[in-house]
A protein has these predicted regions:
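Active-site-proximal beta-strand elements of phosphoester/diester hydrolases
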Residues: 38-51, 159-169, 202-205, 259-264
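Binuclear metal-dependent hydrolase catalytic cores centered on His/Asp/Glu-rich metal-binding motifs
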Residues: 121-143, 155-201, 211
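N-terminal membrane-anchoring alpha-helices
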Residues: 1-32
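Conserved beta-sheet core of the metallophosphoesterase superfamily
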Residues: 202, 207-264
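Beta-strand-turn-beta hairpins that frame and shape the catalytic cleft
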Residues: 30-42, 143-144, 150-163, 254-261
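Membrane-embedded segments
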Residues: 35-144
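Active-site neighborhood of phospho(di)ester-bond hydrolases with catalytic His/Asp-centered motifs
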Residues: 42-45, 73-79, 108-115, 146-149, ...
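Solvent-exposed loop/turn segments at secondary-structure junctions
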Residues: 47-49, 80-83, 115-119, 151-153, ...
Length: 264
């Protein structure tokens, strides 16, 4: 039985799980969210596009199924590129970005970058800034990119803000340019300073780690990165990203401070 498990687990991880599309619905009422403001958001996180695991046909299928949900707004939460050795054919970024450009929602499609979208761009790692070629591909496809910026929207006669921060692990240590530690390019304070009224705020942040720094002004923080714990066997997560907090691995998390609800 132990040997069967040792063989079947990798087989499932390589041959089955990457080809499954997991669709999860949440019905939330975040704090400071107006009673009459009904917003249906579709979230796409961590597609890691590459052959054979996430080819263009799968991206096309995800776009089609997302559009079929008829969301009001579509939010893309980063890590569009695989950036690892377990692929036999990287896919040109404009090819998949153009497919994501076919996403359709009345309030549009909006994106942030993830750590792999920075790590896989050697020029961006050297210069310490963007635009990355993956971010540029999204812009070319007509998808606005949120790198420490906020934008106001109106729906059903009520306003809300969408904010997005740049990646918290964007720049790796780099001996050639004497960068000795990880460097994030996120600016939470500067991003939220762009919010000019008391309308509720949705915040896109690729890594969920920042939630403890997010002020109560934000109604809901939306993240990817954790892949539900990477490997999640009945709650056991042996391959969870070391820089992330395990309690933020999956689902809808409500943070509290003492007995007071603090943030979602």
């Amino acid at each position: 039985i132990a040997m069967l498990g040792a063989v079947s687990a990798p087989a499932y991880a390589i041959g089955v799980e990457p080809f499954r599309l997991s669709l999860k619905h949440y019905h939330l009422t975040p704090p400071r969210w107006p009673r009459g403001l009904n917003l249906k958001a579709a979230l796409i996180a961590d597609p890691h596009v590459c052959d054979p695991w996430m080819g263009l046909e799968r991206v096309r299928s995800i776009v089609r199924q997302t559009n079929a949900l008829k969301p009001d707004i579509i939010l893309m939460l980063g890590d569009y590129v695989a950036s690892h050795k377990w692929q036999y054919d990287p896919i040109p970024p404009q090819a998949w970005a153009d497919l994501f450009g076919d996403l359709s929602a009345p309030l549009g499609t909006h994106a942030i970058l993830g750590n792999h979208d920075w790590w896989d761009d050697a020029d961006a790692q050297l210069t310490g800034g963007g635009p990355t070629r993956y971010g540029q591909a999204l812009l070319n496809a007509g998808i606005p990119l949120y790198q420490n910026r906020a934008q106001r929207f109106d729906k059903d006669g009520q306003a809300f803000w969408l904010a997005g921060i740049d990646d918290q692990l964007a720049l790796r240590p780099h001996r050639k340019i004497k960068r000795h530690r990880w460097k994030g390019l996120d600016d939470l304070t500067g991003t939220l300073a762009q919010v000019t009224d008391d309308a509720p705020v949705l915040l896109m942040a690729h890594e969920p780690d920042i939630i403890r720094e997010v002020p109560g002004r934000v109604s809901l923080t939306l993240s990817g990165h954790t892949h539900g714990g990477q490997v999640n066997c009945f709650g056991y997560k042996p391959a969870f990203p070391k820089r992330s907090v395990k309690s933020y691995a999956y689902g809808h998390i409500v943070e509290t401070e003492g007995t007071k609800l603090a943030r979602h």
